[in-house]
Amino acid sequence: MYGRVAITALAALSLGAASPPPEHGGWIDNTPETLAALAKSCKGKDGWADPAPPSHIYGNTWYVGTCGITVLLVNTKAGNILIDGGVPEATPMVAASLAKAGFSMRDVRWIVHSHEHFDHVGDLAELKRMSGAKVAALAPAAAVLRSGKPDPSDPQYDLLIAKPMAPVTVDRVLRSGDTIRLGGTVLTARATLAHSAGSTSWTWQSCEFRVCRTMTYADSSSTISADGYRFTDHPQRIAAVRRGLEVMSALPCGILMTPHPSASGMFERMATGQLFDPQACGAYAKSAVARFADRLATETGTAAPKPVQ
């Protein structure tokens, strides 16, 4: 068993004979107070290396990232899965959060990611070294991880090239729909190629006291770029973005989490107990569709003029 969660007497009484959450770990229960602590600690801060306290989200899923970058730990009876890593400066913070939550880096068996930009995978080589875990990624992301260099076709290439990464050995190349199976937990990878060529969203089931939720880690939906890049010069990229957002909108959805917490109001939803929302993924993707349409309209000169203030 890889850690135990504390169960309050009140929760045990209210749930009668229900079994405790299976095999999930650590010393922090997901009470309103602990969920609110993360939002309070990060209020006014969203730096990629701003330290944040670990937080138990639901069932076997934990937040062990920083104020600005999500890192998730999924705990199983056969070891743990880490989703995303962060910038190199955040590596000791992620390791410390795991320890504070009652986990060990040595128990991480797999490392996967959302997309292949340095703010989310810049420290994967070191996390792999520390844990001995295997790394899995979609083919476009695997190429970037193995080389440590960004994809030249990435809209953000001119920004990313200034931030080279330590190369990472990729142990398994995934296709959309493939799964990572560990200790009875199944993570499903889906290519949602809006933000990058290797953008990956993940879904899995997490249960507490016989109440199971779909956990949905939807990748970044933004279509930002380096100065001078025009999506309208790259019709294949436009098609990939539209298809990616379409897939994202249709993801099985229960508890939405995103690589940048602020992109989905993640901390605020945790603090107010409003995490479960089957419509959240569709709304998240819909807003991105509108923003991308605005971007294309601006590029083609067909954007509606802004009202005079």
Residue ranges and their predicted role:
Residues 1-7:
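Bacterial N-terminal signal peptides that target proteins for export
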Residues 24, 61, 89-92, 99-179, ...:
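Active-site HxH/HxHxD metal-binding segment of metal-dependent hydrolases
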Residues 47-101, 105, 201-223:
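Conserved beta-strand hairpin/beta-sheet module of binuclear metal-dependent hydrolase folds
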Residues 41-43, 51, 56-59, 80, 87-89, 107, 169, 179-182, ...:
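Metallo-beta-lactamase
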